[in-house]
Amino acid sequence: MDIIKKLAEELSIGRHQAEAAVKLIDEGNTIPFIARYRKEATGSLNDEVLRNLDERLKYLRNLEDRKSQVIASIAEQEKLTPELELKIKEAQTLVAVEDLYRPYKPKRRTRAMIAKEKGLEPLADLISMQMTAEPVEKAAAGFVSEEKGVASVQEAIQGARDILAERISDNAAFRTYIRNITMNKGVIQSSAKDEKAQSVYEMYYNYEEPVKKAAGHRVLALNRGENEKMLTVKILAPEEQILGYLEKQTIVRDNLYTTPILKEAAADSYSRLIGPSIEREIRSDLTEKAEEGAIKVFGKNLEQLLMQPPIVGRVVLGWDPAFRTGCKLAVVDSTGKVLDTVVIYPTAPQNKVEESRKILKDFIKKYNISLISVGNGTASRESEQIIVDLLKEIREQVQYVIVNEAGASVYSASKLATEEFPAFDVGQRSAVSIARRLQDPLSELVKIDPKSIGVGQYQHDMNQKRLGEALEGVVEDCVNKVGVDLNTASASLLEYVSGINKTLARNIVAYREENGAFKSRKQLLKVAKLGPKAFEQCAGFMRITGGENPLDGTSVHPESYDAAGKLLEKLGYKPEELSGGGLLGISRKIKDYKRTAQDLGIGEITLRDIAGELEKPARDPRDEMPRPILRSDILEMKDLEPGMVLKGTVRNVIDFGAFVDIGVHQDGLVHISQMTDKYIKHPLEAVSVGDIVDVKILSVDLAKKRISLTMKGVK
């Protein structure tokens, strides 16, 4: 197989692009590095295309390796023919390769094997030829043998039938046909193990839909219901059509004596061997596709969450709400440094409201707090009411935001949090995390396992390794899109930088602590175990503000410093002029990009990137994202009425819709059918996590705590 050609076709890119990307990946370059600094070679392939290419490259190479193993195994058995070898080499999927290998694959002891050991294969061949002019029983009598364990004529025929059934099952063409027809005409059906039992799976108690239309989130829901012993799930195939096909393929002559036996063999082969196997394969395939879709949605949601814009220059009060143990508060300055912590008890059972209000007023005055970040967990509603009442009394302009605290408790009990705040208890660490995730979501959320951040669906039911790798890739892409400040970034953030692992991240922090702030990117080469390759991969994503070389504060890669210097000189600028916030209009001064790029010895794409960076150094892509809604008043669910129009924040996007926070402690659901007037395949075509959207209330169910929203017809 020509892997490069296959990749180019699948991803709709040029062959030269696929070839260059594969070469760069094989040379050990990271996806963020290739996407940012090797655009010339790849024709500007972005990180998403490169990650898809990398994933498919691994699959196709694994496929080729498996083909080689299968060919070698069959050759060793001296059963390899040129036709079979060609079929294996031309196979496009692992399933197709395994189908071709099935007849030659070492098996556990089957009924057919036992029959062969009893010497019944010649009888199976006789039946298969369909030429006998006398009853098969007559020929079978010759195979009855006490020594071989064949006690009767019927036992001999049954053994021959078992051999024929396995031959039918091992036929790759038959399996392909049955797999395709089951996928296209089969029905996935579920029923309740106990119809009287109340559960979240009630809609699946008597449920069926065509296999080919089974939506990913429903497949995962059925799997979970089955695993929790609430549902029985099966695939109903068009059995009559399948048996008709098998009979047509295996019965070539209408022979009075062999036709009934062959029909029985075909039916047995399907019901005992092929059917259950194909059902397992299809269920596995549906699950894999559903997981793939869920991982993509999770990844997109995570990206939007990580790329929320930081809130700069404000002192934030982090508030971790609770009842019995009290609300933990942490004051964090504009750089993320913890100024103070305290525990207050305004909620039940202690209800020390006045004492708590006094502490809050003192904190707001003392630290000039202008923003309160409240976790959305237990006692969040009661905490919000206390804050709103307080804000009405004080003169200071203070706002608050309800923050998704998913993962805060996981982080606060982690080894990392213990190392960061050894003197704090779990609640204090959680309050700090809640404050910081509003100030700089990316820097804080990288400390938490992405699976704990709470923006996925069925994430605990899927392949954890696959999910973990995909989400790690998302975090890596986000960190490198934004870049990091080499002198303030934590080890948790640094480890996601291109070319940097956990060890190197810790070594960078250790070097910084021992030697003071980095003054130059070149100093990275003095960090233990950080060699030239790691430097090449990471340097462009590390920024130094106020360093020896102004270019170190940009995303211009050190390999392009010479070209950038010559460009500045050519246009009449000095490097130090960069420190003033960029050289506006520099890109317009370059009249002929092609000629200028040739003069500088770089590519035209690289020149445009350098010019853009000199114009606006280290621009933050998060600045273009929607900012969180800052509130100063409270809304109750009982206040909601159909027809009300509100502004809300998209908290989670799933296959069938999006959950929107409208400020009432219960996210409302905008079903996919209520998002736009035009047809969309997936909610992500209309919204993303973090989007600020206008919604209208459709209905409110106070008992079930459900809010239905629409985005249609909202002005």
Feature roles, as predicted:
Residues A18, T341-A348, L371, A413-V426, ...:
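Short beta-alpha connecting loops at secondary-structure transitions
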Residues E281-G299, S452-G483, Q598-P642:
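Long, charged amphipathic helices and adjacent flexible linkers at domain junctions
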Residues T30-I31, N46-M113, K118-E147, K481-E624, ...:
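Accessory alpha-helical DNA-binding modules that contact the DNA backbone or grooves
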Residues N180-V187, W319-F323, T378-A379, V403-V410, ...:
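A glycine-rich phosphate-binding loop feature that marks nucleotide/adenosyl-phosphate handling sites
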Residues A139-V153, Y207-E208, Y245-I251, N255-Y270, ...:
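Low-complexity, acidic/Ser/Thr- and charged residue-rich accessory regions of DNA metabolism proteins
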